Amino acid sequence: MSLPPLVEPASELTVDEVRRYSRHLIIPDVGMDGQKRLKNAKVLCVGAGGLGSPALMYLAAAGVGTLGIVEFDEVDESNLQRQIIHSQSDIGRSKAESARDSVKGINPYVNVILHEERLEADNVMDIFSQYDLIVDGTDNFATRYLVNDACVLLNKPYVWGSIYRFDGQASVFWSEHGPCYRCLYPEPPPPGMVPSCAEGGVLGVLCASIGSIQVNEAIKLLAGIGEPLVGRLMIYDALEMQYRQVKVRKDPNCAVCGDNPTVTELIDYEAFCGVVSEEAQEAAAGSTITPKQLKEWIDDGENIDIIDVREINEYEIVSIPGARLIPKNEFLMGSALENLPQDKKIVLHCKTGVRSAEVLAVLKSAGFADAVHVGGGVIGWVNQIEPDKPVY
């Protein structure tokens, strides 16, 4: 369905702007009016990472007048494989500042506003209220539900994207005209069930594919052209090079945008998404050791069995000496339990400690009462014990 333009047009374009945007201006559906609307638009991008990088660059190139960036992280070398708004010289810098500099380099006429803070329930309403449209470039479920609920409560549209390995998804959520994210995903998946990009990986160029689609949808909404992806989920398979669409209907029983909503104010989203399950938290309490403690046990010849619960491709990048690989899913399915020694202390680890805590809960319930896991995982080990090893 077509929707009216989201913003009013700016009063005029300068001679330099006409020259810059001339290839837009000669498109009948965009023209002078559409470009003026882009100039007058205020768009917020949540995140300057894999999706935020191409989104910000193309929004800037398109002539969106004001771009807000919510980002609190710093540029890491592992980001550069996909986060093309940053460069080698930006490693260690604020992502927000790095993104701002790239945006200004692409288009000096864009006004950039930085929000160098973590997006949370106590600041999201104030930040979002300053913008016409939100572009969601987040990679965790807690923030996705936060973005969705804030947009519903503020009646703001937002363009959503998701990436994992070779697969991508995109849609436009606007509860006034169609479904919201909760209509599609009423409940978050169990903690640890869906790996993040840091755990499962992502093809770098996939970020550009989905990020560009997000910008395309943003331009359509701002200028009031075409049919935005409201009520439609676009699914992209990069390996098969296939696009398909699934219709998504507004759920009358949706907790936030339904006929009788139960979520009428923002909640604790990390608790809602169970960033670490209660079982894992309980299991880890009193059963977490540091990388330095593990190093002491190894040096002292303690009778331990170090088990890495990551995936094999992660194990091949970097591992703790003496650790053997048993992926998390083998524990969740129960197949790994029978092969565990009864006469050794089990020491679990993963990348950062989240997955190993989940496995620890499984072992505790199976009777391995003295099992422990390494807080901080292999990343903590590298940082504290073997800093010359690679991280990812």
Describe each model-derived feature in a short phrase:
Residues 2-6, 107-121, 125-213, 223, ...:
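E1/E1-like adenylate-forming module used to activate ubiquitin-like modifiers
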Residues 38, 127-132, 340-341:
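A short, aliphatic-rich alpha-helical micro-motif
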